[in-house]
């Protein structure tokens, strides 16, 4: 009986040790999973930072002036993703579903918390739900204007704005398709919106926000040049004496003709259509950075501000949401992924009207 009692005690002790070991292993595995999840949770934050541009040194407190945050984002239309699935080989299908991507996009956009959000590849039937969920998440009175691509495409450009902060004075949708112009035979569009601050002391300050998504075909820079020229013609008329924030996916490298034309270098474009062309400055998102992958990590997305003395007021950039470095992009791998809902990175900038 004594031996039996010792045997039972030994069995119970062994059982307790095994349970403790299993429990410890489970806690360890759970801890590792949580740590990995935490690392993945914060990996995006480590790649992206808001960087001051130093313009506060001009004696203006950005919290007491007419400042606003703009985010521009090509969010990858689901219909286009499904049409070009071969571009996303190697990415788990769960990361490509609209439900998962929308969840990731909402999390990112709510954290960025823009006053004005410019979207490219915004699928028309997804826009109302996306905006409603943003409203529920940030409590802002969001409104929007939208322009679908010409023809049968289901995506286009949207400008979402905080209607409690801004009054929408006017907007214009521009189709970059013109039967009379040989190079303007594509379905791309642009969208303009003119805003005024609602605060009584700032009501005289107006500005224009414009967004576009130019042709993708890497061999047709001539078409993109013609599209830029048309956008500038329309912007010149629409903006009159109002400063402009121009955003979008231009599918053009920084040293390409379309971008050089925008920043006043003219490139290979005949500027006779704009006798007094608008000139812009790129809000620099950092050296050696990238916004998307096109056979290599490149920048094709931009936020720009208009320059010159034609405007009563001017836009002063206060800070920029720095893009990830090419090395970080390579390390992070393909996008969309576990945390990011698009195949582009979002751009952001804070401006003040002076």
Curated annotation (Swiss-Prot):
GO biological process, one term: mitochondrial mRNA 3'-end processing
Alphabetized InterPro entries for the sequence: CCR4/nocturin_mRNA_transcr (IPR050410), Endo/exonu/phosph_ase_sf (IPR036691), Endo/exonuclease/phosphatase (IPR005135)
Record Gene3D superfamilies: Endonuclease/exonuclease/phosphatase (3.60.10.10)
Region spans: Disordered: 22-59
Pfam families cross-referenced by the UniProt entry: Exo_endo_phos (PF03372)
Entry keyword Membrane: no
Keywords, in A-Z order: Developmental protein
Gene Ontology CC annotations of this record: mitochondrial matrix
Tissue-wise expression: Ubiquitously expressed in embryos.
One Gene Ontology term of the molecular function aspect: mRNA 3'-UTR binding
PANTHER family recorded: CARBON CATABOLITE REPRESSOR PROTEIN 4, PROTEIN ANGEL
Family listed: Belongs to the CCR4/nocturin family.
Name assigned to this protein: Protein angel
Organism: Drosophila melanogaster (Fruit fly)
